[in-house]
Amino acid sequence: MKTTPFTPYHIRNGARMAGFAGYDMPIEFTGINDEHTAVRARAGVFDVSHMGEIWVKGPRALDLLRYVGSNDAASLYDGKIQYACLPNGRGGIVDDILVYRIDAETYLLVVNAANVEKDWNHLVAAGERFGLRPGRELYNASDEIAQLAVQGPLAMRIVQRLCPAADLGKLAYYT
């Protein structure tokens, strides 16, 4: 089972661990009800390093995203994020994803942990149409990126204290 860079911290701090999508993940520390209430009232930090990250790069990156995605990634600007799904072409959905536009030729897709391989294969197959090659314009960085999510009504205040040089108040939704 895979671990995240934060696993030693979780264990040191008494997390109850369980398997999810091939990862040993923290399920709770002090109790699910207490933690739920804390996040709803204040904030909480979640290890979401099990999520998948796939880079799509090059002059045909947007063409691929418009072909495989349910939303129009052409409406994104640098730093903007879009929620979308990957339709399977048969009336169903491969997965729901987040599309981050880094610049006009660089996008980062965040995909669900349980679907990384399925999403990767779907993107590689579709990428052939646009000359996008695995390991080059398409790159699965899922085992190289760790993520923490700060959620709750005080999340922005907490992150602002960690990043005092950034004016997070200027960020629009999904940026």
Predicted regions and their residues:
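Basic, glycine/lysine-rich polyanion-binding surfaces/domains
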Residues: M1-T175
